[in-house]
Structure formats: C-alpha cells, structure tokens
Amino acid sequence: MSSITIETIEVKERRILCVRHIGPYQDISQAFTILEDELSTLGIRAEAMLAVYHDNPAEIAQALLRSDAAVQVSEKHHIAIRRLTADRIAAGRFARWIHKGPYSGLHATWQAGYQSMHQLGLQSKGVCYEEYLNDPCNTAPQALMTAIYQQIS
C-alpha cells in the first residue's frame, strides 16, 4: 500500500436520502440496490453517492453494525418517501484521504488512513463515510476513486 495523504478540511452539511443496513459493513451492497431502485422509481438524481458508517467495528458485533447507503440530494428532494429516510451529515472538520482501486481494497486504505491520522495527532469522533467519485458501471476497477471522510475533533 502506498502512503496515505491526509487532508484536514471543513465540510459543509450534506442532505442525504438513505437506506439503513444492519450487519457487516461489507454487505451494504444490498442497501445500495434498494436505494438505486427507489431513486430510479422516483426520478431523483443524486448529487453524490455515499456510504455512511455509524459504529466502530472494533467495539460493536458485526451483526449489529449500522450503516447507510446514501445519496446527497438537493433540498427539493430531501424528504422521507417510500423506503428512503431523509437525514443530514452535519458540517464539521474532517480528515479526508483517497482510495484508488477496487472497492475490495478499501479496508486496507481505511486502516492506513487511521494510522496516518494517529501519527498526525488527529482524533476521530462522530461520523465517517465514503464518497464514490466515479461510477463503477463505466470505470475499470483499478481506476475507481473513493474519498474517505472521518470527522475529527
């Protein structure tokens, strides 16, 4: 794994529509399938595709982990409807680093990012999420780009 570059940035509030997933984080694809079906049915266009993680897998049993398959949407579409929940990711200070390559390598990039944060003296708190910067339907796995965000104190 190449070295991780951590940026500290201020992130604006994000309005999201989401589908909750309970269970191992690597199984969130089921929630994304529901999310994509709902968005297609409702004709809602996503501004960004996200996966939001609520629990620390080192502290919570895999079967109880909470995550959301989510999309950032305009204020006009920020309503709970059908199987979608309206939520917000609060504005704040975040550490951000980039993963390039197949999603199967994300776990190693998360771990390397947390090690780099520790070396920089950054303390994680609150929400963390992934933002998928390109479309896996028309991007080779080696070229996929994912931004990882961890709220910091």
Question: What do the predicted segments below correspond to?
Answer:
Residues 1-153:
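A solvent-exposed interaction/effector surface
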